Structures are given as structure tokens and as C-alpha cells.
Amino acid sequence: MIQTPVIVTFANQKGGVGKTTLCITFANYLVTKGARVVVIDCDFHHSIMKCRKADIRKYGEQEMPYEVWAYEANDKAMMTSLMEKLHNDPEIEVVLMDSPGSLKAEGQIPMFVNSDIIIVQFHYDLVTVPSTASFLMFVERLKKAVGERMKARLFIIPNLND
């Protein structure tokens, strides 16, 4: 039996690989299957939150298919508190987290450690592949450093390939 909520983080230190797009696409899919979803926008650009605000301006305050919360990934203590809150919320089945395209945000440590699934998108080019490899090495070092506290399953997904 899967324990809910399931926290899925879309991550890569390389920007432009499709983290935000895949996060929203997955949120929309899960909602059509009846899941109670919350999207946490931790990307520095807060693109998901900006789109949600634009939707509200255009369509009004009608019921949205899922909530979007914006958080800064720079604050480690705040992110630790958020992850604890999410893990203890019985109203949520799936949390989708859009992480920043950088490893400079200290809040990413508790984000990754407390995720159930980390999805790493990349595309095949001379810049993205080495950057993604570096990110994957970071995740492996983090797993070794925190031990069994980090139970996240890692999925590596090629994106934007022909």
C-alpha cells in the first residue's frame, strides 16, 4: 500500500529541461484520474504561480483543479517545516514539487531528502548531459550523507528528444 501523500519532485540543476512543463502536465493528468493534488512552485521564476494568477484574472475565482503554493527554496528551515506539514496532511494524495534549476538553494536538501520520488528530466545535448550527470552525482552523495532518511526513488527521463 502506498502511503499518502506521495511527494514527487521534478529536479535538475539545468534549467530549460522541462521540469515545470512536466510537473503541470502530470498534475493535470492526476486530477483527471481523481487524485487530490497540490503543486508546490519552488522554482526561482515561480512560473506555475504566475500562470495560476493569470488564469484567475482571466477566468475568475472558480474552483481550480488543484492548489498551487509558491515557496522559496532558499530557506532550509522553512522547507523542512513545509515537508513535515505536507507529509502529515491527510487531505492531500499527491504533492508535485517544481524545484529550481540550480543547486544553490539550501532548501533543496530537505526537499530531496523528504521526497518519495525524484524525477530528473534532461535532453541530449553537450551542455545538459554533463550538467545532469553532475546533478545525479550530487543526489547520490546526498543519499550517502543522510543514509536511510532519504528513501526517494529516482527516475531519469529524456525529454525534448526527437
Predicted features along the sequence, with ranges:
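Hydrophobic positions on the alpha1 helix immediately C-terminal to the Walker A/P-loop
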Residues: 21-22
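Short coil/loop residues immediately preceding or within conserved phosphate-binding loops
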Residues: 5
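Conserved catalytic-core segment of NTP-binding enzymes
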Residues: 38, 100-162
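Conserved beta-strand position immediately N-terminal to the Walker
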Residues: 8
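P-loop/Walker-type NTP enzyme "switch/lid" segment
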Residues: 2, 11-13, 17, 28-102, ...
